[in-house]
Amino acid sequence: MGMIISMAMTAVTIWTKTKPGRVSCFIRKNSTMVNAPIGIIGGSGLYQMEALKNVEEVTLDTPFGAPSDSFIVGELAGVRVAFLARHGRGHHLLPSEIPFRANIHGMKQLGVKYLISASAVGSLQAEAKPLDMVVPDQFIDRTRQRISTFFGEGIVAHIGFGNPICPQLAQCLSTAIAGLELEGVTLHDRGTYVSMEGPAFSTIAESNLYRSWGGTVIGMTNLPEAKLAREAEIAYATLALVTDYDCWHPDHDHVTVEMVIGNLQKNAVNAQQVILETVKQLAANPFESIAHRALQYAVLTPPDKFPAATYEKLSLLLGKYYPPAP
């Protein structure tokens, strides 16, 4: 990462307020014009890629505070992409401390339409072995201490979340994995991701409970991330990298940090290849996702009842349907 940072150009986005009549809104000033249609959230190892060119570091502020870190923006296969270290460089944020709203808002600022979440997970099923890759299609939310919406404070919205993963983006990931024929890696192209609070790993009783619910993998980060991405009208899919069998399997050791890191390092190059191939697919065949219009009918509060301060915070999300009054 040191070499990338030394080569990076710094771009700072400053948010200032203007009042176009009915409400205030945020505008960006004095910033490098960055538009990256594809975003990747994961570990810092993901953007240490030889294929990543024209790299710059973009520091953003948001109405929801600072993101986990600066965004690393560059070109993969000629396409602008934005990477973000979910836990910050140096992995200094607990899962419960991740500024999920700021991270997703930052991706929205950068013009991201497709967001890939690369995540370490434990397996809850024997067939999903360590080093395998899972592309889930469902979530179970077991988090307790996290704000899971941009809305509130006078503006009410209810997004549809029955199918929480964008099926087209998930298919791109699955096709990329299958086409690479990675040695020792089996693709599981559907499954249920159980998102727990952490930071402690599961008890045996909890692990077996999640298995009885049909859980495929377990992790600590994809919720509320996926919900917020849907509210921001960003297509979202998960590349789940299996590192362990949690603690339920009688023939395997219980999960440890050492085990997780060891298997993640083994899978880092594979994950980079999958991301590169997925970016190529998206560049060749961009698509409109149901996520891209998730807010169209989701807001219940009449626009003339929007509190000015709340609209100001949400203008990047709401402006498409509720532009500021002239």
UniProtKB/Swiss-Prot annotation:
- GO cellular component assignments: cytosol
Pathways involved: Amino-acid biosynthesis; L-methionine biosynthesis via salvage pathway; S-methyl-5-thio-alpha-D-ribose 1-phosphate from S-methyl-5'-thioadenosine (phosphorylase route): step 1/1
Q: What class of enzyme is it?
A: transferase
Q: What is its EC number?
A: 2.4.2.28
Q: Which UniProt keywords apply?
A: Glycosyltransferase, Purine salvage, Transferase
**GO BP terms in the entry:** L-methionine salvage from methylthioadenosine; purine ribonucleoside salvage
Q: Give residue numbers for the site Important for substrate specificity.
A: S202, V257
Give binding positions for phosphate: S44, R86, H87, S119, A120, T221
Q: Give the InterPro entries listed for this entry.
A: MTAP, Nucleoside_phosphorylase_d, Nucleoside_phosphorylase_sf
Q: Where, in this chain's numbering, is substrate bound?
A: M220, D244, Y245, D246
Q: Cite the Gene3D superfamilies for this sequence.
A: Nucleoside phosphorylase domain (3.40.50.1580)
One GO MF annotation is: S-methyl-5-thioadenosine phosphorylase activity
Q: Which reaction does it catalyse?
A: S-methyl-5'-thioadenosine + phosphate = 5-(methylsulfanyl)-alpha-D-ribose 1-phosphate + adenine
What does the subunit section of this Swiss-Prot or TrEMBL entry state? Homohexamer. Dimer of a homotrimer.
Q: What does this protein do?
A: Catalyzes the reversible phosphorylation of S-methyl-5'-thioadenosine (MTA) to adenine and 5-methylthioribose-1-phosphate. Involved in the breakdown of MTA, a major by-product of polyamine biosynthesis. Responsible for the first step in the methionine salvage pathway after MTA has been generated from S-adenosylmethionine. Has broad substrate specificity with 6-aminopurine nucleosides as preferred substrates.
Family recorded in the similarity comment: Belongs to the PNP/MTAP phosphorylase family. MTAP subfamily.
Q: What is this protein called?
A: S-methyl-5'-thioadenosine phosphorylase
Q: Which organism is it from?
A: Synechocystis sp. (strain ATCC 27184 / PCC 6803 / Kazusa)
